[in-house]
Structures are given as C-alpha cells and as structure tokens.
C-alpha cells in the first residue's frame, strides 16, 4: 500500500558535549554557557509538521511572571498580557507531540515594549522589541528558554523562533503622517514619553532614536505608512507607527546579526520564521543571513547545515493570477545573488483555501493555485502551508468545522510543511484566544482548552500520523485530477511516489455532488483503500477503477476521503445505458435555457445532473420509443462567462455518460432594477442612528469623506442572482486588504421568504434589531472576509452557522463603488426573488480578529466614540430593500 517512512525524528543527532562547549564562544563575548543538548543536526524539513503558538496565549507555567506591576497584565483584555510563558510551553510538549507535530514555532520571546499608550495596545505578542538579546520578563529568562530547547530536542522535535528585523516598538511618532515632507524628516517628529517603565532602557544602537536631519542613524525618520502601494513607503516608512529600523546602517546590521546568532548559539534554535520580510530591502537579507558573520554561518557552526528560514511576505493572489507568488519569489533563494531566504509562508494558498472551503468559490481556483505553486517555486516541498494564523480571522470565524476539515486535509496532503496554529485542534474561532484557563477569551469563557479527546484534536492526530509515516505524503509528485469551474463541488488530486499513490477526493458544496468518471490514471480494476474520511461515515472502504481507469462517486455535502492505491486488482462491470445525445454540446456557449434531447434504453429512469449537483438533478423518463428531452435552465447560473458541465446519469445504476463541458455567458444589465439615494447622512466624521458617533482618531480614517458612508445603492438582478452596488463617500485600501477596501465593513441581513422557520429579529454583534420583520441569513463583508451565516446558533454575540457561497466582491476605487454579487445558492436557490429583503449596515471591523470595533464615550485611535458600549454599532444604513419579480 504505502512505503512506510520511519519516524524522521528518530534520526536526530545531538552534537557531542565537547563540540557544544567549543562553540559556546563563537562570534560573541557573551559568557552564557551553551546547554548540553542544545545543538542538534537539522532535519529534512519537508518531513516536518509545525505547531505554531503564541507564548502569551498558550500556557501559564509560572504565574509569578504574569504581573510586572505596570498595569500591563489583564487576562480580561485582548490588548494586554495574559500570562503564558516558556515554562508553560515546556509543560505542554506532550500535548503538542501527541497531536503529531514534530516542530514548534513560537512567537518572539524577546523583551518587548509592554504598553503603547499612543495605540492603546500592548506588546504581549512579542513583535514590539525593546531588546532583541533578552527574554521578556513575562516569558521567563535565558535558562527557561534553554530548558525548553533541551526538552524539545529530547523529544526528537525542533524549535523555530519568530524574529523581527524591520522594526522595534513605538518610541517615536509623527503627528501628521499625511503632511510629511521627506526633505524635512524631523518636522512633526516627536519622541513619545514614558514608553518604558523605570529601569528599562533601549540598548545601543536602538537607543539612538533622536531624529537626524541628514537622514542617517539607526532608524528611518519617517511616519507611519499611508500608502502600502508605494514601494518607498513599504521599505522605509513605519508599519503601524512602529519605529522602522535603518537596516542599511552597518551598526544596525551588526546588532541584528549578533542578536539572532545568539539565540542559535546559546539556546539551540533550529530555524527562524522572519516577520515583515517585504518591508526590508533585499540586500539586507543577503548580508543578515549569508555574510561571514551572518545567521547561516552560526547555524553551520552549531551543526545545523539545513537551518530553515521562512519569511512573512503577506501577499495574496486573485483567482487565476499570480501577483502574490511573483512578489514572494523575489525574497527566496540561497544560490545566486543576492542570496536570501530558504522559503516563504504560502499566503496565496491560504487565501485560496479560504475562498474555496470557507466561501464556497470554485474548486478550480485551488487547482490553479496548487499548479502554480509547483511550477513557480524552487522548492514547494519546504513552503510552510497554513489555513489561518494570529494575524487574520480564524478559519472557523468564516467557515464550518467540515469546511475546516477539508482545508486541513488539503494542507496535510499537498507538498509543503503543514503549520497548525494553536487552538485549531480545539476548533477555536477567535484569533488570539488563550489556550489555558484564566487567559484571555473573546467570549469571556476562561476555560482550559487542552482536550486531547476533542473531535478536531483526534482528526488532526490521525492526519498527522498518516503524513508522518508515509513518504508519498511528504515527497510524492502532486497532480490535480478533478475540479469544478462553476462553483463549489468536486476537488480531487493524487500524490505519487514510485509505486505508491494517494488519492484525495472531496466535495466542497452544501449539496451532494457527482464525481463523474474521474480519470485516476490507473489501469482498469485498480483498487484504492480508504485511509481517512470526513463527514461521510459510510464512505466506500474501497474504490475500483473501471475498464477505462475512471472512478464515479456520489459525494455527500462537505465530505472528503483519502484513499491509497493497493496492489490488488478487481474486475468491475459498468452498465450500458445506451445514451446518445442528439446534439453535441461539448464546448458550446449558451446565453439562455437549452433543450437537451437524445436516446437511451426505452423506459429508463435517468437524471440531468448539472455541475454535478445531485440535489437539483432533474428526472428524465425515457419514452417507449427510446427518446427523451429535458430543459437545462440557466436561472441559477452565475453571471459572466462561466464553465459548466452536465451529465445524463442514472442514480439507480450509478452510471451515465461522461461530463459534457459547456460555457454560459450571462450579463448584468447596465440599468439597475432599483436605486436608493442615501447621500447626506453619516458624513463629515459623524454617524450613527442619531448622528452623534465620531470616527476613530487614527489618521487613516477620513473625517471629511468617511469610508463608512454610503451615498447610493443600486440593485441588479438576473435570474436568481442579485448584485448590490454601493457608491461610497470614499474607498481606501491602505492596508492592502484582499477584498480591495478597508476602514468599512458591511453587515447585510437578508429576509428570504422560503426560509422563515428560524428567522430572528435580533442583529448579532451590533446591538440592534431589524427595523421591521426578521432575517434569515446575514452577510459579513469587509477587507479580509466575505461570509454568509444562517440563524442556526445565532444570538446577540454569535453570527450563526457559516454557509456558502459567500458574496463575491468587486471594487472600482476610481468611482468609489463596491459591488457584491449574491449567487442564487447564497439566497437559498429561490425560484423567485419576489419579496426578498436586504437590510444594509456599515461599521468597521478589525482585520485581525474579525470583530467590530468598540464604541466608547471617549475618543481613541481604533474605537468609535460618542456612545455607550451597548448602543448599536451602525454608522450608516439603508432603508430596507425589497425585491420584486
């Protein structure tokens, strides 16, 4: 079946004590000894599974460290330290190991700025350094870090440290970034007072932070980035007002190199995840990593000849394009000039998996993304793959558990290094919730979350075991052999290594789907044995290829199965239904309904299955004369040029004709069905139900032309599809959001006449009720997310159950319009749009946590003001839109 791969961790080599001691002084005057057991040989990284954790939010092992007396500790606040530490990580190594992870990636353990009064936020996360060479007091000390490394290596596991070179904390600022003049770099510059408690200070050269008019020094004397599309700002301005290091300065480079050589030399770190890579000039990476006094030399000196460096180049790609990959590729390469990073985090794949699995978009998007991954990157087998992380909304905030299982199967089964973000194995839905009892939880339920018998823990454990024990899962060639272009549906791929093969099949749709005559490229009679299944308890234990090497399956909604090829061979009989079509529709383009006619066995019961959807399959009764005809309706087809498939199929005999591929070309009218004029309100920096709310004070919120104000809405309909186009006061994309706009989020409530049984009047999370009537589904659309939820489980604090497909978003920044297309399936596939109602509201959501920004009485940089926290979070809204047909 499989060629079994011995546990790769059994091959770990701990360097002899004599070598470790000899290396303890390399490149440093530091006297801290190297712990025995700290230095081990590098693994083959493609065989690894990484568990990523935030130190502060993972586990509290030493409560004496929690409160340092500076009002920086508060487990009830998402902004402050919660109490996790390095001892806590050591205490839970068995939990991580038993899950199946073989490496641990921790957030930066270095000493941080504890509180930034300017941003009203804390440095619990580790990315706001004040000293790159010390362990933060909340996390422990050098001894506890060395102990963690020693214990990790004793378990035949590996340790990856998150590092930052682009910036430190927020110790200086500019009062008005929009008036910055590069020729006068110190104009508007201001050192921030009381950024560090008494007794703390910045080391040299980080303490050289008085602005220099000649532009030299330890920092770039620039304000916060106002335009992420500007390459100069990207490389030299401040990210989120964090002081941007002048990484071209020799003293800064020397300090950073020695800082990170130290963690390899004195702790025994096995790899670096590198933060904010794209904000630093390319030449820096060549020097920092590959110079004689660089990181890689230190790694080799400690016996690590395959030290992994993977960077955060936060770039995604639109469907069927590769702009993200192209940017990422410029930072990879350990040969040629300049040498740079080993690898990068696979953001384009993550975004595509979210589109396909959580939002119900075409599975062919994933086919394209995986093929480009294999074609474009020099070694995709060592690219870390992930479904979410600490800097974005959790997968489960926008998708279901079954959606996430499909994403995890994909992540574990495609080439690359799987990365499991802490809490995924406990089905967490909040971005930075603590795992330990008493740590911060968004829902206020401060419970322990280390259940090793939870559904997701056991599921990931099973996947990890399959991957770790079989070479084909880590090293096999990949080929996508099935995908749907019209929407959610079938996705299938293989991994092949020598005589071993894995077949992965899944259905991303809410409906049962026909995987029709999938070519598995094997000889007829080849037998595949089930290994793992999701959401399909009675999935076939074996699949047998027919005489043509094809497999046909009726896949339940949201199901997935992994099969492995066996050495067995069985014969299989395929019924002959004698189906012949009267017209060849293959490759044809249609602009409306068509009639499909043909012949088959007399009186046969058949079905017209369009786009594989068995739930909407039309029954065909063949006449006594052997003739049949059936109308294929385009009412529920998406707008634009779309590729489809249909089959004439017998659900009774599990056989039919091969899929016929065709194209539909439907278009929106240039004239809207309805127009709603909403200009004049929610402007001039004021909004809310009574016009008394004020915008957050951060300068990226436009007080004159608010991004949250809707001036006009237009409604377009074709068949059962609806487009809502909003003309906004202003559209910005300051933060390069994947959906093309930021500083506004739409919550749109839909009242669907065909879904009234569980309707609600309360509007989740925004402290309001429907102006009239009730709602059936709600769409949440902002720069980083597009999702639809039904009312199952919905209440004042919960959106409900995620359903697909989500609205597709199109932005025309020049004309200040945002269009959202609601496919027929998003509206419950109605036969008529008559009576469907939309209630549209705006507010801003945090792109990290997918939570609505707070409403407070007092002004703040990231909170709305002028109201109580329990008042409605609606900046602007529209009168209820009622459709008629």
Q: Which stretches of residues belong to each language-model region?
A:
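Substrate-binding/active-site clefts of carbohydrate-active enzymes
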Residues: 42-48, 56-262, 266-267, 287-299, ...
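Active-site-proximal helices and loops of the catalytic beta/alpha 8
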Residues: 149, 167, 258-379, 383, ...
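Carbohydrate-interacting/catalytic domains
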Residues: 2, 11-20, 25-52, 67-71, ...
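Structural beta-strand segments of beta-rich domains
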Residues: 590-596, 720-722
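Acidic/polar low-complexity flexible segments
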Residues: 659-681, 751-775, 827-885
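Surface-exposed, glycine/proline- and aromatic-rich loop segments on solvent-exposed faces
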Residues: 670-673, 677, 694-785, 848-849
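Short, compositionally biased P/S/T/A/G/V-rich stretches that sit at domain boundaries
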Residues: 567-590, 668-712
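Short, well-ordered beta-strand segments enriched in hydrophobic/aromatic residues
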Residues: 501-507, 720-731, 818-824
């Amino acid at each position: 079946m499989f060629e079994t791969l011995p546990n790769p961790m059994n091959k770990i080599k701990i360097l002899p004590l004599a070598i470790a001691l000899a290396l303890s002084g390399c490149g440093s005057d530091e006297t801290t000894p190297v712990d025995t057991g700290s230095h081990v040989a590098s693994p083959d990284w493609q065989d690894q599974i990484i568990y990523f954790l935030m130190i502060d939010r993972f586990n509290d092992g030493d409560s004496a460290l929690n409160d340092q007396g500076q009002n920086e500790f508060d487990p009830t606040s998402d902004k402050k330290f919660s109490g996790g530490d390095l001892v806590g990580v050591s205490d839970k190594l068995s939990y991580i190991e038993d899950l199946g992870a073989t490496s641990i990636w921790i957030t930066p353990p270095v000493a941080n700025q504890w509180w930034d009064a300017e941003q009203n936020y804390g440095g619990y996360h580790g990315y706001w350094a004040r000293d790159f060479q010390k362990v933060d007091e909340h996390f422990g000390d050098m001894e506890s870090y060395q102990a963690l490394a020693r214990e990790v290596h004793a378990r035949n596991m590996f340790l990856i440290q998150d590092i930052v070179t682009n910036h430190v904390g927020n110790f200086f600022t500019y009062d008005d970034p929009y008036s910055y003049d590069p020729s006068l770099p110190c104009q508007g510059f201001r050192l921030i007072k009381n950024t560090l408690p008494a007794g703390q200070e910045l080391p040299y050269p980080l303490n050289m932070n008085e602005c220099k008019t000649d532009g030299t020094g330890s920092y770039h004397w620039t304000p916060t980035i106002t335009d992420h599309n500007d390459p100069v700002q990207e490389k030299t301005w401040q990210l989120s007002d964090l002081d941007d290091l002048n990484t071209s300065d020799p003293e800064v480079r020397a300090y950073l190199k020695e800082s990170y050589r130290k963690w390899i030399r004195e702790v025994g770190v096995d790899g670096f995840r590198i933060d904010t890579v794209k904000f630093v000039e390319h030449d820096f990476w060549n020097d920092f990593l590959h110079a004689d006094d660089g990181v890689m030399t230190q790694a080799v000196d400690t016996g690590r000849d395959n030290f992994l460096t993977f960077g955060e180049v936060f770039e995604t790609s639109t469907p069927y394009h590769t702009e993200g990959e192209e940017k990422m590729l410029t930072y990879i390469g350990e040969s040629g000039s300049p040498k740079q990073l080993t690898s990068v985090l696979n953001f384009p794949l993550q975004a595509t998996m979210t589109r396909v699995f959580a939002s119900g978009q075409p599975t062919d998007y994933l086919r394209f993304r995986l093929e480009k991954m294999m074609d474009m990157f020099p070694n995709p087998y060592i690219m870390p793959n992930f479904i979410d992380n600490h800097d974005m909304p959790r997968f489960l905030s926008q998708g279901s558990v079954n959606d996430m299982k499909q994403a995890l199967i994909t992540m574990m089964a495609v080439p690359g290094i799987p990365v499991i973000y802490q809490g995924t194995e406990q089905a967490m839905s909040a971005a930075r919730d603590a795992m330990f009892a008493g740590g911060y939880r968004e829902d206020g339920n401060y419970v322990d979350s280390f259940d090793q018998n939870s559904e997701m823990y056991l599921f990931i454990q099973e996947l990890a075991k399959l991957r770790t024990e079989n070479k084909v899962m880590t090293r096999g060639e990949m080929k996508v052999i099935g995908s749907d272009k019209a929407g959610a549906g079938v996705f299938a791929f293989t991994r092949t290594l020598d005589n071993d093969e894995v077949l992965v099949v899944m259905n991303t749709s809410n409906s049962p789907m026909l995987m029709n005559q999938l070519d598995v490229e094997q000889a007829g009679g080849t037998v595949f044995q089930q290994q793992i299944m999701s959401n399909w308890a009675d999935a076939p234990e074996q699949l047998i290829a027919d005489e043509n090497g094809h497999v046909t399956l009726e896949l339940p909604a949201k199901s997935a199965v992994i099969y492995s090829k066996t050495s067995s061979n069985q014969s299989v009989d395929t019924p002959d239904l004698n189906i012949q079509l009267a017209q060849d529709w293959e490759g044809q383009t249609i602009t409306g309904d068509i009639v499909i006619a043909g012949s088959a066995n007399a009186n046969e019961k058949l079905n017209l299955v369009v786009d594989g959807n068995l739930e909407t399959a039309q029954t065909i009764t063949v006449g006594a004369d052997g003739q049949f005809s059936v109308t294929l309706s385009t009412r529920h087809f998406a707008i634009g040029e779309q590729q489809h498939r249909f089959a004439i199929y017998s659900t009774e005999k599990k056989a039919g004709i091969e899929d016929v591929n065709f194209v539909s070309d439907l278009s929106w009218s240039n004239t809207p069905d309805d127009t709603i004029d909403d200009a004049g309100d929610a402007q001039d920096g004021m909004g809310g139900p009574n016009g008394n709310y004020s915008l957050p004070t951060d300068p990226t919120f436009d007080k004159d032309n608010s991004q949250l104000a809707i001036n006009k809405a237009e409604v377009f309909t074709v068949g059962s599809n609806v487009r809502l186009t909003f003309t906004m006061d202003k559209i910005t994309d300051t933060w390069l959001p994947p959906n093309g706009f930021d500083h506004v989020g739409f919550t749109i409530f839909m009242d669907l006449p065909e879904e009234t049984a569980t309707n609600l009047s309360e509007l989740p999370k925004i402290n309001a009720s429907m102006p009239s009537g009730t709602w059936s589904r709600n769409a949440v659309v902002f720069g980083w997310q597009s999702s639809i939820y039904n009312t199952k489980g919905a209440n004042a604090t919960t959106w409900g159950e995620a359903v697909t497909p989500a609205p597709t978003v199109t932005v025309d920044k020049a004309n200040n319009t945002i269009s959202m297309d609601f496919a027929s399936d998003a509206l419950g596939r109605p036969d008529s749009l008559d009576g469907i109602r939309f209630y549209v509201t705006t507010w801003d959501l945090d792109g990290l946590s997918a939570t609505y920004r707070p409403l407070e009485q007092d002004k703040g940089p990231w909170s709305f003001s002028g109201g109580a926290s329990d008042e409605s979070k609606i900046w602007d809204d529209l009168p209820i839109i009622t459709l008629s047909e």
